[in-house]
């Protein structure tokens, strides 16, 4: 299991309570979704339409309609799946679909004001999941201005319009600001106090101080051309580890698997405030689920969440979030986004630095990682711990320990509660995209705005004494079969033992220091050993005789602490997952 100062049980992130009962949708009243009217103040230079399934594609009347159900006359077809690189000049890239201006213009900026905005709107009742992009562009060669607009269903190219304004900046601003007002009912100059208006678009808050992946690739290409490119001073095993956890492309692929739309809100660009707003929406969804409100209130809460955190469901209707499990999955998504925000900022390279980029990334972690020899005592004990606590119910894969790193996080040793007894070396697992955040910031507790019912024993740092329980939270696959597991020294002190999940477990401590969820199987104390002052609960697991007379019994133990100072990261394992053949 793993834990982060904010993550889930048994090793990954948020853990959902067991729930088998799904609830039906309630009926909701329709919203007025009449398309906005449009005026032109400048000459239209170019207005290209995407092919539509029947009927004439009139921009002024279809820009708010093409997002609906598949098969309607105004549903746009996707004509290309080609990936286009972003060319970044200034603080925001020109939309790659604006072929007339890519490489020839840049997004206009005035100080910290970037005339680039992505709007989003989701309405489950009408199967709306749409975006509206507006950019004010300035030509590179001369002071000619234009306004680029593109709109459609999330994940689709949609329709677009390019309005030329020659050298008249004021007219270009007027068009940009009016379109923003039309779509949001907010004034552009007051966007710092933006308020979502029902039936209108929301504004995605972007961080323009963060480099995009494409800018980083450009920097890497430039650095490779330098004849003075320094060699890395890191051990080769550490170099490979840093490459693994700082792989932005892999992060993007992982987020796409979770249905997050990386084109509308590129990784590293979504602000902390936007992610926090996503948590607040999930809290509303949690309130609806707990109150049994499965009609209009739940639908509006889901609309708000998908509007704030863009998802790509293709032409399918965005699903209602109706169960604790579905809520937990969205909490995991936001936690991953938060970690990726940290990672994107950390991997920004300094071209003029005397260090190799990998050395820069490693230094920015503020976390020492020392490879251990495979013949060392620590390696042998931990390898035995890994294999002997592989749970019998997790039989679809085996694990091979590739490398072991001793971890020394800046400040953790000094802050650690050594005064507490009952210190154990316990497991925590997490997605590959989360490790930069974990190693640079430590294991963290979920933020206050996160729903509490997404966590089995409340908002704490979760650990396991069974390796595979935590390994499941690595979400490895046959194609991506490398994962990382963390072993932390956890000062458990006196445990409050529970037979079943309770999201309010922290409030039940009554002077105790941690929560322990009791499982049916666990390592026997007869096999325990001590490593550097911590108890290592070696397996194999045996029947504990634990039975919950009132309901479901946990399969394996859960350990939860609610204070990061009770955790000290000690070892990081690089593991290969060997999945069994299906036939």
Curated annotation (Swiss-Prot):
ADP-ribosyltransferase activity is regulated via an allosteric activation mechanism. In absence of activation signal, PARP2 is autoinhibited by the PARP alpha-helical domain (also named HD region), which prevents effective NAD(+)-binding. Activity is highly stimulated by signals, which unfold the PARP alpha-helical domain, relieving autoinhibition. Poly-ADP-ribosyltransferase activity is tightly regulated and PARP2 is removed from damaged chromatin following initial poly-ADP-ribosylation of chromatin to avoid prolonged residence (trapping) that has cytotoxic consequences. Residues 57-67 have a biased composition (Basic and acidic residues). This is Poly [ADP-ribose] polymerase 2. Residues 104-201 form the WGR domain. Residues 356-583 form the PARP catalytic domain. A motif (Nuclear localization signal) lies at residues 21-22, 35-40. Residues 1-77 are annotated as: Disordered. GO terms for cellular component: cytosol; nucleolus; nucleoplasm; nucleus; site of DNA damage. Auto poly-ADP-ribosylated on serine residues, leading to dissociation of the PARP2-HPF1 complex from chromatin. Poly-ADP-ribosylated by PARP1. Residues 1-103 are annotated as: N-terminal region (NTR). It is an enzyme of class 2 (transferase). Its EC number is 2.4.2.30, 2.4.2.-. Changing residue 428 to A: Abolished trapping at DNA damage sites upon binding to PARP inhibitors (PARPi). Keywords: Acetylation, ADP-ribosylation, Allosteric enzyme, Chromosome, DNA damage, DNA repair, DNA-binding, Glycosyltransferase, NAD, Nucleotidyltransferase, Nucleus, Phosphoprotein, Transferase. The modification N6-acetyllysine is found at residues 37-38. Its main location: nucleus. InterPro entries: ARTD/PARP (IPR050800), Poly(ADP-ribose)pol_cat_dom (IPR012317), Poly(ADP-ribose)pol_reg_dom (IPR004102), Poly(ADP-ribose)pol_reg_dom_sf (IPR036616), WGR_dom_sf (IPR036930), WGR_domain (IPR008893). The gene is PARP2. Residues 231-348 form the PARP alpha-helical domain. It comes from the Eukaryota. NAD(+) binds at residues 428-430, 437, 444, 470. GO terms for molecular function: chromatin binding; damaged DNA binding; NAD DNA ADP-ribosyltransferase activity; NAD+ poly-ADP-ribosyltransferase activity; NAD+-protein mono-ADP-ribosyltransferase activity; NAD+-protein-aspartate ADP-ribosyltransferase activity; NAD+-protein-glutamate ADP-ribosyltransferase activity; NAD+-protein-serine ADP-ribosyltransferase activity. It comes from Homo sapiens.
């Amino acid at each position: 299991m793993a834990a982060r100062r904010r993550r889930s049980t048994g090793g990954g992130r948020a853990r959902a309570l067991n729930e088998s009962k799904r609830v039906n949708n309630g009926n909701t009243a329709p919203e007025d979704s009449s398309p906005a009217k449009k005026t032109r103040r400048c000459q239209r230079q170019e207005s290209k339409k995407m092919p539509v399934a029947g009927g004439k594609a009139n921009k002024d009347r279809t820009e708010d309609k093409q997002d609906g159900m598949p098969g309607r006359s105004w549903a746009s077809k996707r004509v290309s799946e080609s990936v286009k690189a972003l060319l970044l000049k200034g603080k925001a890239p020109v939309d790659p679909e604006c072929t007339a201006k890519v490489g020839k213009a840049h997004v206009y900026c005035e100080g910290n004001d970037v005339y680039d905005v992505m709007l989003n709107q989701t309405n489950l009742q009408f199967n709306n999941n749409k975006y509206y992009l507006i950019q004010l562009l300035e030509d590179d060669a001369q002071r000619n201005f234009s306004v680029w607009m593109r709109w459609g269903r999330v994940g689709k190219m949609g329709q677009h319009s390019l309005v030329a304004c020659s050298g008249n900046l004021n007219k270009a601003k007027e068009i940009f600001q009016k379109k923003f007002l039309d779509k949001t009912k907010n004034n552009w100059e007051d966007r710092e106090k933006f308020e979502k208006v029902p039936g209108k678009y929301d504004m995605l808050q972007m961080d323009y101080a963060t480099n995009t992946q494409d800018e980083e690739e450009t920097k890497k290409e430039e650095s490779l051309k330098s004849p003075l490119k320094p060699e890395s001073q890191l051990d080769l095993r550490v170099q490979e580890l840093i490459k693994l956890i700082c792989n932005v492309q892999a992060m993007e692929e992982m987020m796409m698997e979770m249905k997050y739309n990386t084109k509308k809100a590129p990784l590293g660009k979504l602000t902390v405030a936007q992610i926090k707003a996503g948590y607040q929406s999930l809290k509303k969804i949690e309130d609806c689920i707990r109150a049994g409100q499965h009609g209009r209130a739940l639908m509006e809460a889901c609309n708000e969440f998908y509007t704030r955190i863009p998802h790509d469901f293709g032409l399918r209707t965005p699903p209602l979030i109706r169960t604790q499990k579905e809520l937990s999955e969205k909490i995991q998504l936001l936690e991953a986004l938060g970690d990726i925000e940290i990672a994107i900022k950390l991997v920004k390279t300094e071209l003029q630095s005397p260090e190799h980029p990998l050395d820069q990334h490693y230094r920015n972690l503020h976390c020492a990682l020392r490879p251990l020899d495979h013949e060392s005592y620590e390696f042998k004990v931990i390898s035995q711990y890994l294999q002997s606590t592989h749970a019998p119910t997790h039989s679809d894969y085996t694990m091979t320990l590739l490398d072991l790193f001793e971890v020394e996080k800046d400040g953790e040793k000094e802050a650690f509660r050594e005064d507490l007894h009952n210190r154990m070396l316990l497991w925590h697992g997490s997605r590959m995209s989360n490790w930069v955040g974990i190693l640079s910031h430590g294991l963290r507790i979920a933020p206050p705005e996160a729903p509490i019912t997404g966590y089995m024993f409340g908002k704490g740092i979760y650990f396991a004494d069974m390796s595979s329980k935590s390994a499941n939270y690595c979400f490895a696959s046959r194609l991506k079969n490398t994962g990382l597991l963390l072993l932390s020294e956890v000062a458990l002190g006196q445990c409050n033992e529970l037979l079943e999940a309770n999201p309010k477990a922290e409030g039940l401590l009554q002077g105790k220091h941690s929560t322990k969820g009791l499982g049916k199987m666990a390592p026997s104390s007869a096999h325990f050993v001590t490593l550097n002052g911590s108890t290592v609960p070696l397996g194999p697991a045996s029947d504990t005789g634990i039975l919950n007379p009132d309901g479901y019994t946990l399969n394996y133990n859960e350990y939860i602490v609610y204070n990061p100072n009770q955790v000290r990261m000690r070892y990081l394992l690089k593991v290969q997952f060997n999945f069994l053949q299906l036939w």
